[in-house]
């Protein structure tokens, strides 16, 4: 078995609020939101949890929760608490990605892949490499990755995190890009 250095697990979940929630009176909505914040805060004591609004950017999601943990079990505990909350009654999970960080097989001078900074925006990019990628030699793949690393170094304002997906979906990797200005991300990838 290869000697692979594993790190924390990453869970990205996108939620859509049902229209019924918007029809609740102001006090009921406030009560549900307050309880939801308490649930997230409780689970943030052990693991890093970040929330991002996607309102106005995605039709199928209103917000995203990104969890970083040493144990997959904590994701289950948090999901159970969210589902049993008042707000949970009005939430549909539109997307979910489960992955683990590990040291890349490709050599580069990058830093730690942990979520450390508190950036304003996060772009999640689930991806799968195609068969032609794996038909290339390791040397060819390393050269292509070196090109990616060179480009990435020109955009230090974008923090890039790579994690390796597993689960029931077809995603192979979950890339996350953190930044304070979304135009920085588009400059990086264009």
Regions found by a protein language model. Name each.
Residues 47-53, 157-164:
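A short linear hydrophobic-aromatic micro-motif
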Residues 82-90:
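A common structural junction motif
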Residues 14-16, 66-68, 176-178:
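Short hydrophobic/aromatic beta-strand micro-patches
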Residues 1-44, 70-76, 94-154, 166-170, ...:
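Short S/T/G/P-rich N-terminal loop/turn motif that feeds into the first structured element of a domain
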Residues 58-62, 91-93, 120:
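Short connector loops at helix/strand junctions that flank enzyme active sites
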Residues 53-59, 164-169:
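A short beta-turn/loop motif at secondary-structure boundaries
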Residues 61-63, 123, 171-173:
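Short amphipathic alpha-helical segments
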Residues 55-63, 68-69:
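N-terminal interaction modules that seed assembly of large macromolecular complexes
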């Amino acid at each position: 078995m290869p000697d692979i250095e594993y790190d924390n697990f990453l869970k990205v979940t996108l939620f859509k609020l049902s229209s019924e929630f918007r029809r609740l009176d102001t006090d009921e909505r406030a009560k549900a939101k307050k309880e939801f914040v308490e649930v997230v805060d409780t689970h943030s004591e052990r693991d890093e949890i970040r929330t991002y609004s996607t309102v106005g950017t995605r039709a199928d999601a209103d917000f995203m929760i990104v969890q970083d943990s040493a144990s997959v079990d904590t994701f289950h505990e948090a999901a159970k608490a969210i589902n049993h909350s008042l707000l949970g009654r009005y939430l549909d999970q539109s997307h979910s990605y489960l992955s683990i960080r590990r040291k890349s097989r490709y050599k580069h001078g990058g830093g730690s892949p942990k979520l450390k900074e508190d950036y304003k925006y996060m772009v999640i990019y689930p991806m799968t490499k195609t068969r032609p990628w794996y038909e290339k030699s390791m040397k060819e793949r390393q050269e292509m990755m070196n090109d990616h690393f060179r480009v990435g170094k020109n955009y230090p304002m974008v923090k890039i995190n790579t994690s390796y997906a597993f689960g029931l979906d077809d995603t192979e990797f979950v890339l996350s890009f953190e930044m304070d200005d979304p135009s920085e991300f588009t400059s990086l990838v264009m």
